[in-house]
UniProtKB/Swiss-Prot annotation:
<dbReference type="GO" id="GO:0022625">
    <property type="term" value="C:cytosolic large ribosomal subunit"/>
</dbReference>
<feature type="region of interest" description="Disordered">
    <location>
        <begin position="1"/>
        <end position="21"/>
    </location>
</feature>
<keyword id="KW-0689">Ribosomal protein</keyword>
<dbReference type="GO" id="GO:0003735">
    <property type="term" value="F:structural constituent of ribosome"/>
</dbReference>
<keyword id="KW-0687">Ribonucleoprotein</keyword>
<dbReference type="Pfam" id="PF01016">
    <property type="entry name" value="Ribosomal_L27"/>
</dbReference>
<feature type="compositionally biased region" description="Gly residues">
    <location>
        <begin position="1"/>
        <end position="10"/>
    </location>
</feature>
<dbReference type="GO" id="GO:0006412">
    <property type="term" value="P:translation"/>
</dbReference>
<comment type="similarity">
    <text>Belongs to the bacterial ribosomal protein bL27 family.</text>
</comment>
<dbReference type="InterPro" id="IPR018261">
    <property type="entry name" value="Ribosomal_bL27_CS"/>
</dbReference>
<dbReference type="InterPro" id="IPR001684">
    <property type="entry name" value="Ribosomal_bL27"/>
</dbReference>
<protein>
    <recommendedName>
        <fullName>Large ribosomal subunit protein bL27</fullName>
    </recommendedName>
</protein>
Length: 86
């Protein structure tokens, strides 16, 4: 006779792969042109001067320089800019 009951089935056992979103370069850091600054879903951070935005809302540097975070407008939207290195 079997000493254990049958295993049965489960509806668990799967998970989605992490998307690795978030800020990749922080304020004050030097970066080369083309570097990713923020990976995001939607525009939590908006592009400022010398920052481009990809079709998946990724923000990237358009020039070599220093990253700067700030707020803009009446709604205080978070803006990311790149300031040229002196």
């Amino acid at each position: 006779m079997a000493q254990k009951k049958g295993g049965g089935s489960t509806r668990n056992g799967r998970d989605s792969e992490s998307k690795r979103l978030g800020v990749k370069v922080f304020g004050g850091q030097q970066i080369p042109a083309g570097s990713i600054i923020v990976r995001q879903r939607g525009t939590r951070f908006h592009p400022g001067t010398n920052v481009g935005i990809g079709k998946d809302h990724t923000l990237f540097a358009l020039i070599d320089g220093k990253v700067q975070f700030g707020f803009k407008g009446a709604l205080n939207k978070q803006v990311v800019s790149v300031v040229a290195a002196e």
